[in-house]
Amino acid sequence: MIIQKSREEIELMRESALIVSKTLGMIASEIKEGVTTLHLDKLAEEFIRDHGAVPSFLGLYGFPNSLCMSPNAQVVHGIPNNKPLESGDVISIDCGAFKNGYHGDHAYSFEIGEVAPETKKLLQVTKESLYVGIRELKLGNRVEDVGNAIQKFTESHGYGVVRELVGHGLGQKMHEDPEMPNYGKRGRGKLFVEGMVVAIEPMINLGTKNIKQHKDGWTITTADGKPSAHFEHDVAIIDGKPEILSTFAYVYQALGIVSNEEDEFRRIPLVI
């Protein structure tokens, strides 16, 4: 069952989402060649707690850390470790924060040093596909309309769309209805409703769509060992239209990137 949120609840969720956004921005200022993912994980936990929140992922289903950190051929759910990042790596960093009874949850894929052109393009297309999908989150549409848009856009570039891992509803629980696949057929799935909040998160592979699970029980990797990309936003339906509650603006500020990609999804301009 889709849980509709009041405007007041959505604003509480926006606060949680923006703590995640700020955490990713802090990570963006620290991430570089030679830094370990475990070090970044500890920084993130401290940052989240300093902002009056609790890391959503720490202990969730038994997960041991605050961040899911998935480099290169890892798709999602990578466990932070002491291996230094290297030039040429790409890494998905997925973060969650729980405050005022509600979760925020979103992700960004970072480039470390000089990244191969084909991998840079994968990240660009995957991020673009996130917004292609978000445009379909509106009254009158259904769940698979979002997935269909993401699938068509990314497969047109020859990429593999992961099937087994999906986005999800978000609220007082980290994972609520509905599941939000990144593939599908138009006109299928649950009908969208006012006040719903979902995490839309394309997970797109440079090669095959197939994945496998690491022996640690968490880490998901591409079956062919080629890179994967992952971007995620929290999005509400307000007045029948999609509104992004999270933002990449803090990441962009740290990286010196200028972008207006989120502007069409905001009723009120974001001030950072």
Across the structure, where does each feature detected by a protein language model lie?
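Active-site neighborhoods and metal-handling regions in enzymes and metal-associated proteins
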Residues: 1-272
